Amino acid sequence: MSASTDQIRSTADSYIAALTAGDLEAVMNLYAEGATVEDPVGNGTVHEGKAAIREFYASVVAMKIEGEVLEARVCGNDLLFNFEITTHFDADSKATINVWDLMTHDEQGKVTSMRAYWTPENMR
């Protein structure tokens, strides 16, 4: 039995909530064992397996982040969603980035592949 559309769609909100909370375990709970993460697409690095994914996200959740899902679409086991996150580096320095993520899910609703589409031009 495949994951439901609602279950897959909820991944977007859970992902942004986990990043905002700085909750590495919540992020990791979204991923299947053999998952891959490419963030951003085209940078030449694909993080393969939970250990590599954990190492990647450890530095992300260490930052103070605010985020919001702007749009999400589910087609089969794929979730395409647009979001903005603002990273606060200190009291006077922050950056906002607009990102499209494509996540593929397995039958249990776990993410098997995440590809993040953004470039420096998407930052302000």
Residue ranges of model-derived segments:
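A beta-strand edge to alpha-helix "cap/lid" segment located at domain peripheries
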Residues: 2, 23, 38, 44, ...
